[in-house]
Amino acid sequence: MKTSVLAMAVGIGVMVAVPVLAADHVVPTAPKNYLDMKNPLKVNKDALERGGQVYERKCKKCHGANGDGKGEAAEKLTLKPASFVTPGYLKGRADGQLYFITEKGSPNTDMEAFGPGSETSLSKDDMWKVIAFIRKSYTK
């Protein structure tokens, strides 16, 4: 009986705490040297095609095929992935901020780091290409 009461209390505590923690999450900003960065690539058909391939392999499972944050893996996450299609979301983010998040990940979320030296280790070039693809495909 005591175990059941304890388990129920813990369960209620988790149900209350998770939304509160999620509400406190903010999209990470970036150090000034990143915020000042602009995408150095010439955005052309080839760059967008490669960015789309990277998005398909690395981003779609969480951010979704439509960039809405509703990928197949998103259901299992406490903090849902960013929806790139939310009006103003991408316009309010500097290229360097998106690069920083892609390279370093997002603290206290399941957004992993994709930069050189990470487990997935995308090249700088591929990170810029996927950012160009996201901007071109999902900016509202």
Which positions does each model-derived feature cover?
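Periplasmic/extracellular electron-transfer cofactor-ligation site
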Residues: P31-L35, G52, E56-L79, K104-A113, ...
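Axial heme c-ligation environment in periplasmic c-type cytochrome domains
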Residues: A22-A23, E75, A82, E103-S137
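Bacterial N-terminal signal peptides
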Residues: A9-A17
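Sequence context surrounding c-type heme c attachment/ligation sites in exported
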Residues: E49-G52, E56, R93, Q97, ...
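Electrostatic cytochrome c docking/interface patches
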Residues: D24-V54
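Gly/Gly-Pro-rich "capping" loops immediately C-terminal to redox-active cysteine motifs
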Residues: D68-Y99, S123
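Bacterial N-terminal signal peptides that target proteins for export
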Residues: M1-A9
